[in-house]
Amino acid sequence: MITTESISAIRKQVLAWRLKGETVAFVPTMGNLHLGHLTLVREAKSRADHVVASIFVNPMQFGQNEDLDAYPRTLSDDQSALVEAGAELLFTPTPSIIYPKGMEAQTFVEVPLISDQLCGESRPGHFRGVATIVCKLFNIVQPDIAVFGQKDFQQLLVIKTMVEDLSMPIEIIGVETIREDSGLAMSSRNGYLTAAQKQQAAVLKQTLDKMAIELRAGKQTDEVISTAKQAISAAGFDNDYLDIRNAKTFNKADSSDAEQVILVAAYMGATRLIDNLIVKLK
């Protein structure tokens, strides 16, 4: 696997593949890779001739009091894991390469409406940072396909909307959330949890599963949410949000919606965890 922080080197290699009529899939990450990330790489490998990955801890998507400096950097281990999963090219730029004029002077991309809700409301500017870096990486790599995890459901929808609105010729693939044995969604931030907290955190997925059963049984949305919030709080979480949306439009869910998504964000101690579950009702 070739590892480079050079934009021109990435473009040169991708062009060489394209001149041979070969396809390229892209998996952007922030590093500290786990099985969930590697599943994305393997999915990318199954869909294209070549896989490009990136590792960039994007300062634009972190808020003032968030864990940018503490976010784990594990490049050597990540490189080994990416090779095993099938990546052939790894882009590891520095902030000065991505934002040479600084973030304040950087042109940005913002997807309206969806970016201001749920995670966007809790983390102002987060999705602007996500959309900007993903747009920039897409312009650098110019992939045929890009693969993302469904664990970050709102992020996935933001990216799909951006690609559609800006007429980018890229197919966006969402891959089902990979979970630990307890049901806890795999996340780089799980490393912040103690063993006891990890066991407590399994309540998130258990609660989502129970909510799905209640929705399929015809229980009212507000009642389902209210009961679930109590269960999450009783497990030691501080609720950020818990909501049910139309899985396609992201509007508030209606009983007539055939496909809904339950979304949750909650704090276990100082660690913010997110999860979601898609529920097909018809």
Swiss-Prot record:
<comment type="function">
    <text>Catalyzes the condensation of pantoate with beta-alanine in an ATP-dependent reaction via a pantoyl-adenylate intermediate.</text>
</comment>
<comment type="pathway">
    <text>Cofactor biosynthesis; (R)-pantothenate biosynthesis; (R)-pantothenate from (R)-pantoate and beta-alanine: step 1/1.</text>
</comment>
<feature type="binding site">
    <location>
        <begin position="149"/>
        <end position="152"/>
    </location>
    <ligand>
        <name>ATP</name>
    </ligand>
</feature>
<feature type="binding site">
    <location>
        <position position="178"/>
    </location>
    <ligand>
        <name>ATP</name>
    </ligand>
</feature>
<dbReference type="InterPro" id="IPR003721">
    <property type="entry name" value="Pantoate_ligase"/>
</dbReference>
<keyword id="KW-0436">Ligase</keyword>
<feature type="binding site">
    <location>
        <position position="155"/>
    </location>
    <ligand>
        <name>(R)-pantoate</name>
    </ligand>
</feature>
<dbReference type="GO" id="GO:0015940">
    <property type="term" value="P:pantothenate biosynthetic process"/>
</dbReference>
<feature type="binding site">
    <location>
        <position position="61"/>
    </location>
    <ligand>
        <name>beta-alanine</name>
    </ligand>
</feature>
<comment type="subunit">
    <text>Homodimer.</text>
</comment>
<protein>
    <recommendedName>
        <fullName>Pantothenate synthetase</fullName>
        <ecNumber>6.3.2.1</ecNumber>
    </recommendedName>
</protein>
<keyword id="KW-0547">Nucleotide-binding</keyword>
<dbReference type="InterPro" id="IPR014729">
    <property type="entry name" value="Rossmann-like_a/b/a_fold"/>
</dbReference>
<dbReference type="GO" id="GO:0005524">
    <property type="term" value="F:ATP binding"/>
</dbReference>
<feature type="binding site">
    <location>
        <begin position="186"/>
        <end position="189"/>
    </location>
    <ligand>
        <name>ATP</name>
    </ligand>
</feature>
<comment type="similarity">
    <text>Belongs to the pantothenate synthetase family.</text>
</comment>
<keyword id="KW-0067">ATP-binding</keyword>
<dbReference type="Pfam" id="PF02569">
    <property type="entry name" value="Pantoate_ligase"/>
</dbReference>
<feature type="active site" description="Proton donor">
    <location>
        <position position="37"/>
    </location>
</feature>
<feature type="binding site">
    <location>
        <position position="61"/>
    </location>
    <ligand>
        <name>(R)-pantoate</name>
    </ligand>
</feature>
<dbReference type="GO" id="GO:0005829">
    <property type="term" value="C:cytosol"/>
</dbReference>
<feature type="binding site">
    <location>
        <begin position="30"/>
        <end position="37"/>
    </location>
    <ligand>
        <name>ATP</name>
    </ligand>
</feature>
<keyword id="KW-0566">Pantothenate biosynthesis</keyword>
<keyword id="KW-0963">Cytoplasm</keyword>
<dbReference type="GO" id="GO:0004592">
    <property type="term" value="F:pantoate-beta-alanine ligase activity"/>
</dbReference>
<dbReference type="InterPro" id="IPR042176">
    <property type="entry name" value="Pantoate_ligase_C"/>
</dbReference>
<dbReference type="InterPro" id="IPR004821">
    <property type="entry name" value="Cyt_trans-like"/>
</dbReference>
